[in-house]
Amino acid sequence: MNILELSEQEIIRRNSLNELRAMGIEPYPAAEYVTNAFSTDIKAEFKDDETPRQVSVAGRMMSRRIMGKASFIELQDSKGRIQVYITRDDICPGEDKEMYNTVFKRLLDLGDFIGIEGFVFRTQMGEISIHAQKLTVLAKSIKPLPIVKYKDGVTYDSFEDPELRYRQRYVDLAVNEGVKDIFIKRSKVYSSMREYFNSKGYMEVETPILQAIAGGAAARPFMTHHNALDIPLYMRIASELYLKRLIVGGFEGVYEIGKNFRNEGMDRTHNPEFTCMEIYVAYKDYNWMMEFTEKMIEKICLDVNGTTEVKVGDNIINFKAPYKRVTMLGAIKEHTGYDLTGMNEEQIREVCKKLNMEIDDTMGKGKLIDEIFGEFCEGTYIQPTFITDYPIEMSPLTKKHRDNPELTERFELMVNGKELCNAYSELNDPIDQLERFEDQMKLSEKGDDEAMIIDKDFVRALEYGMPPTSGMGIGMDRLTMLMTGQSTIQEVLFFPQMRPEKVVPKDSASKFMELGITEEWVPVIQKAGYNQVADMKEVNPQKFHQDICGINKKYKLELTNPSVNDVAEWIQKIK
């Protein structure tokens, strides 16, 4: 690596790395380091009147206070932080004091991983700590972490830029308290849900992510190509159609928690790669599924938070079952004053115009209704609410309503103004299903790029017979947002999709060399901030000379310095 690409701290740390090796200390040892305790457990289990407990711990050194022959550090392991008391003569009992005087005091840096063996005690200030008897270097950090300080519940020098936090999640997890807890809770959400399903006897399965037809949802897919078969394939947008095939095959209840991919926009609640759970249970309907869903979410909330109430932004959301039920057309009538019951597409278009909505000719009846609900109703449902009985045009995979053939037996659960889950009494009439697919193809021909493609193999599966079935899909990322009180999806994804990092534009070396600059000086000039020839045009030759000669000296490059006149001639040649 070019030394000019490193900061002063990075150079110092690399020099320390080399010094450790010269002393015979491997900064990245291969052997297992055996630990027997975590910081939080040590504190929780400590008793003043017991024989001091011997422990072996490992983690990052996050702070250090050196006071001559004795020092305090703060060690951070996977569960928390604990203070360690280190004295020269305890970790260096013999004549050789290098481990303390040289390694600990000078060559180790904040962020380094170390192992500590010692006993637990309480300091005079009352803090439970470890008295170190042995220190082991486990991994050297050659890039300094941001130093975030905490005192009396106040955070100082915080690492809080969202762009940096999401792009460098490893740093975010290491230095920001509370971030790791979000992902621990996410894991508990998954465990609780699986426990609920497994207790009912339903089986977890896996279905293809690469699919020949992107079916099961109305969304734009990512497309790829299989070279050996020479066919296009799609990253799945939903697992629905494959899971229903398993119900056809004889399983009574199946579920899958897996990744879906939709080639659409990114915002506070959408990521192109997201996790979804879908479950299908034979011989059930959407009424049963509503009760099943609210009990599931209540259980998850209790398991994760110990209560059914969660604060999300300014709202306190109560996940205690049962949840309110409102029909979709009833919701639209309540919030707009228009009753869409029995209206055709043109009549609904007129309603949209009266509501001053932006619509276009590609939108069919179902899309128009969906737009009305999204604009005027969805955001009003803060407490968990089932929106039921969707118009048939919006639900190509859903069974017709038993009492009204213009509607379907479908519900969506709205929480905090957003859809959380979607469920049906599944359409199992193969003739009706094929007709619905054909209607979707007509929408596609009109320009609706989210219309579903006909999956003939799925229709064939239905022709063999699928029992009455109810299915439900839930966005695991949004569920985690709610259970952890987060307002953006990026906060609950370890590595959310990010736009490419901005790269500072730089001219090639040849452009600088056209001015008479030797190639070896180009990196120095760019290190000084003159990344393009044009950046030098208005600069004072004296200042420019000081800048580049200063870098030559600071980094000990031992280049022959140009004169001020040489620099002035370079600048004069810039057109």
Swiss-Prot record:
The keyword Glycoprotein does not apply. It is found in: Cytoplasm. Keywords: Aminoacyl-tRNA synthetase, ATP-binding, Cytoplasm, Ligase, Magnesium, Metal-binding, Nucleotide-binding, Protein biosynthesis. It holds the Pfam family tRNA-synt_2. One of its GO terms (cellular component) is cytosol. Binds 3 Mg(2+) ions per subunit. One of its GO terms (molecular function) is magnesium ion binding. Mg(2+) 2 binds at residue 419. It is an enzyme of class 6 (ligase). InterPro entries: Aa-tRNA-synt_II (IPR004364), aa-tRNA-synth_II (IPR006195), aa-tRNA-synth_II/BPL/LPL (IPR045864), DUF4332 (IPR025567), Lys-tRNA-ligase_II (IPR002313), Lys-tRNA-ligase_II_N (IPR044136), Lys-tRNA-synth_II_C (IPR018149), NA-bd_OB-fold (IPR012340). Mg(2+) 1 binds at residues 412, 419. It comes from the Bacteria. Its EC number is 6.1.1.6. GO terms for biological process: lysyl-tRNA aminoacylation. Its cofactor is Mg(2+). It catalyses: tRNA(Lys) + L-lysine + ATP = L-lysyl-tRNA(Lys) + AMP + diphosphate. Homodimer. Belongs to the class-II aminoacyl-tRNA synthetase family. This is Lysine--tRNA ligase. It comes from Bacteroides fragilis (strain YCH46). The gene is lysS.
